[in-house]
Amino acid sequence: MKKIAVDAMGGDNAPQAIVEGVNQALADFSDIEIQLYGDEAKIKTYLKANDRVSIIHTDEKINSDDEPVKAIRKKKQASMVLGAQAVKDGKADAVLSAGNTGALLAAGLLVVGRIKNIDRPGLMSSLPTIDGKGFNMLDLGANAENTAHHLHQYAILGSFYAKNVRGVAHPRIGLLNNGTETTKGDPLRKETFALLAADETLNFIGNVEARDLMNSVADVVVTDGFTGNAVLKSIEGTALGIMEQLKTSIKQAGLRAKLGALLLKNSLYDLKDSLDYSGAGGAVLFGLKAPVVKCHGSSDAKSVYYTIKQIRIMLETDVVGQLVEEFSNRGD
């Protein structure tokens, strides 16, 4: 049985969206147990009876404006901290939260702990592509600054995830750069390129540009945390902007446009689905001793459900256990 600790109080729509997502996951997956951390009375309002779910009551939670490290150290009984502690103590196999991102990163590092020989765990997410296959990208903001050695490790981490969780046999690794030529980039990008090209265990395809990411140019894209976070928010904003612009144009263009939209309804739904990344799950703080997964702060029940599904696959494939062995053998 796979045991997943869930911070029921984190996120804009907690606890309703969190608990409703848990309800659906419990109904669909008979091999998981859920531990809900938070206000018991509020949780019970939305929770369906199930013998594979338990509530660990706490009145304390970490707020969105709390300073991350200070909150983790001072709010020992916060729902997020208790979930991470359950993983450390072996009472849970993974932890999920839609709460304060910085605090969850701190909890992952300070409570759960990183895998030996991994210098800087990276925040990784699955992002949408036009063909619907998606790609993984890291780091998405766990670290403001990175070295070439960190980015090399991210390529290994991302490749492992793509193989074991997404089922990509030979993941194509791309280095995000300002051009595809081998001579492009600043010193960080050039040094990283050399390390990736020299690693025969990776299917490194070279530099990739941001404009090509949604065209499935690579299965895993590696970059520093600052750049990755900016790209992530650009993709999110573009996807939302396209859909809003379509809605506005149809509404303002009159009857003909509305009739045309009706005829194109299935195609428009396909477009919406191709830009919707909620079905891909959450962002993984990869490189820790157990899965620590972050849902978007505005996650609905669907997103929570798919994040639990994602964690279940990670536990089923033992991707973290394989990483521990891999980096133990590398010793770098």
Swiss-Prot record:
GO terms for cellular component: cytoplasm. Its main location: cytoplasm. GO terms for molecular function: phosphate:acyl-[acyl carrier protein] acyltransferase activity. Gene3D superfamilies: Isopropylmalate Dehydrogenase (3.40.718.10). InterPro entries: FA_synthesis, Phospholipid_synth_PlsX-like. Pathway: Lipid metabolism; phospholipid metabolism. Its EC number is 2.3.1.274. It comes from the Bacteria. It is found in: Cytoplasm. One of its GO terms (biological process) is phospholipid biosynthetic process. It is an enzyme of class 2 (transferase). It catalyses: a fatty acyl-[ACP] + phosphate = an acyl phosphate + holo-[ACP]. Keywords: Cytoplasm, Lipid biosynthesis, Lipid metabolism, Phospholipid biosynthesis, Phospholipid metabolism, Transferase. Catalyzes the reversible formation of acyl-phosphate (acyl-PO(4)) from acyl-[acyl-carrier-protein] (acyl-ACP). This enzyme utilizes acyl-ACP as fatty acyl donor, but not acyl-CoA. Belongs to the PlsX family. Homodimer. Probably interacts with PlsY. This is Phosphate acyltransferase. It comes from Streptococcus mutans serotype c (strain ATCC 700610 / UA159).
